[in-house]
Amino acid sequence: MITTIVISIALILVIIGSLISALAAIGILRLDDVYARAHAAGKAATLGAMLLISGVFLFFIGREGYVNMQLIVGILFILITGPLASHLIIKSAYNLNTPASKRTKHDEIKKDLKNTKL
């Protein structure tokens, strides 16, 4: 009984993670500039991958009955590197003066850079 519940939760996590990853891919294709695309890749793809791996982790607990530590390390690795990579992509694009889309109203980074002493 508990095995069926755990596997059902794992299946739901895998499906939700797949849908979020698909939405991230659509966002990367449809959004206007590099800043919005990196935001879609950094947020949605990270969450989607974490849900997928969490679902696989629960599946192994429910089906095989053991805890796979490599999946926990993978979840932590994605949790750390996903947002960091998107931040560095956006920062390098800003430093290269990559133009934003016409829908961008104001630039908050410019005000922050004036107050920063580098």
Curated annotation (Swiss-Prot):
The chain crosses the membrane at residues 9-29, 41-61, 70-90. The keyword Hydrolase does not apply. It is found in: Cell membrane. Keywords: Antiport, Cell membrane, Hydrogen ion transport, Ion transport, Membrane, Sodium, Sodium transport, Transmembrane, Transmembrane helix, Transport. Pfam families: PhaG_MnhG_YufB (PF03334). GO terms for cellular component: plasma membrane. Belongs to the CPA3 antiporters (TC 2.A.63) subunit G family. Mnh complex is a Na(+)/H(+) antiporter involved in Na(+) excretion. May form a heterooligomeric complex that consists of seven subunits: mnhA1, mnhB1, mnhC1, mnhD1, mnhE1, mnhF1 and mnhG1. This is Na(+)/H(+) antiporter subunit G1. It comes from Staphylococcus saprophyticus subsp. saprophyticus (strain ATCC 15305 / DSM 20229 / NCIMB 8711 / NCTC 7292 / S-41). The lineage of its organism: Bacteria, Bacillati, Bacillota, Bacilli, Bacillales. The gene is mnhG1.
